[in-house]
C-alpha cells in the first residue's frame, strides 16, 4: 500500500472528488466522516476553496487508510 504524504500535501478539487468516489460516499457522507458540512465538500471539489490545516491532514489520513493514491489527470478504470 502506497503511503500518502501528509505534511505539505495540498488537496485539489479533483483529488477530493476522486477520494470521495473511491470511498463510495456522497458529499454528505464524506462531510459526516470529516465533521464538516456538505457545502464545504462541494466548495473543495469545485475549487472554490482548498482544504487547509486539520481538514487537509484528515483527508490525507482517510486516503492512506483507504489505500487511495491519485495523480492529477488520472481517470477511474
Tell me the role of every PLM-derived stretch.
Residues 24-43:
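Short alpha-helical DNA-recognition segment
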Residues 10-22:
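Short, amphipathic alpha-helical "recognition" segments used to contact nucleic acids or chromatin
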Residues 17, 42-43, 52, 60:
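Key DNA-contacting residues within the recognition helix of helix-turn-helix
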Residues 21, 35, 46, 64:
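Residue-level detection of the helix-turn-helix DNA-binding "recognition helix"
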Residues 1-11:
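A detector for short, charged/polar N-terminal pre-domain segments
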Residues 2, 52-72:
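DNA major-groove recognition helix of helix-turn-helix/homeodomain DNA-binding modules
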Amino acid at each position: 500500500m502506497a503511503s500518502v504524504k501528509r505534511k505539505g500535501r495540498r488537496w485539489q478539487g479533483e483529488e477530493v472528488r476522486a477520494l470521495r468516489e473511491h470511498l463510495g460516499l456522497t458529499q454528505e457522507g464524506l462531510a459526516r466522516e470529516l465533521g464538516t458540512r456538505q457545502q464545504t465538500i462541494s466548495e473543495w471539489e469545485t475549487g472554490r476553496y482548498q482544504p487547509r490545516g486539520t481538514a487537509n491532514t484528515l483527508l490525507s489520513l482517510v486516503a492512506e487508510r483507504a489505500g487511495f493514491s491519485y495523480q492529477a489527470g488520472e481517470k477511474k478504470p
